[in-house]
Amino acid sequence: MKGQRNIGMVAHDERKEDLLDWVQHNLQALIPHRIFATGTTGGLLRQRFGDLTITPMKSGPLGGDQQLGSMIAEGRLDMLFFLIDPMAPHPHDVDIKALLRLAVLYNIPAAYNRSTADFLITSPFMTGEYIPEIKDYTPYVKRLGAK
């Protein structure tokens, strides 16, 4: 991947303002990229940052996390910024875990807190050439008899 990135953005309710502050701080770095965000997060981003290309998905609990996960599995999402609230229970916790698992499985850069997001956005790989190593799962697939 090089140049324009497809970026997933999610923030739990108690972290939405943190994400908005982070985006404001990094606005110029984000303008060249396409953002795909879960429902409420995407709506807030659109209201505040008209310069960004934002595609809102469904709300996380209504399938938005799974939509982003599908994009990862299909190779259509290059990185994920997901500001997680570790202090609150989430009724759709299984969806969140599935999204995080896919980010790990397909080896896309993912930030779950602001510090890691800062490291990713300032990395030379953000706009430069980067080809993530993808593990070959062929033996696993063949073991199950699937195609």
Swiss-Prot record:
Q: Which residues form the signal peptide?
A: none
> Record's HAMAP family?
Methylglyoxal_synth
Q: Which residues form the MGS-like domain?
A: 1-147
What is an example of a Pfam family matching this protein? Answer: MGS
Q: Which GO terms describe its cellular component?
A: cytosol
Q: What is the lineage of its organism?
A: Bacteria, Pseudomonadati, Thermodesulfobacteriota, Desulfovibrionia, Desulfovibrionales
Does the keyword section mention Endoplasmic reticulum? no
InterPro entries reported in the protein's UniProt record: Methylgl_synth (IPR004363), Methylglyoxal_synth_AS (IPR018148), MGS-like_dom (IPR011607), MGS-like_dom_sf (IPR036914)
**Cystine pairs:** none
- Identification of the protein by name: Methylglyoxal synthase
Q: Which UniProt keywords apply?
A: Lyase
Q: Which Gene3D superfamilies match?
A: Methylglyoxal synthase-like domain
MF GO annotations: methylglyoxal synthase activity
Q: Tell me which residues bind substrate.
A: H12, K16, T38, G39, T40, T41, S59, G60, H92
Q: What is its EC number?
A: 4.2.3.3
Catalytic residue positions: D65
Q: Which family does it belong to?
A: Belongs to the methylglyoxal synthase family.
Q: Which reaction does it catalyse?
A: dihydroxyacetone phosphate = methylglyoxal + phosphate
Instruction: Tell me, in a sentence or two, what this protein's role is.
Output: Catalyzes the formation of methylglyoxal from dihydroxyacetone phosphate.
Classify the source by domain of life.
Bacteria
In terms of SUPFAM superfamilies, this protein maps to: Methylglyoxal synthase-like
Record has Lyase as a keyword: yes
Which GO terms of type biological process are on file? Answer: methylglyoxal biosynthetic process
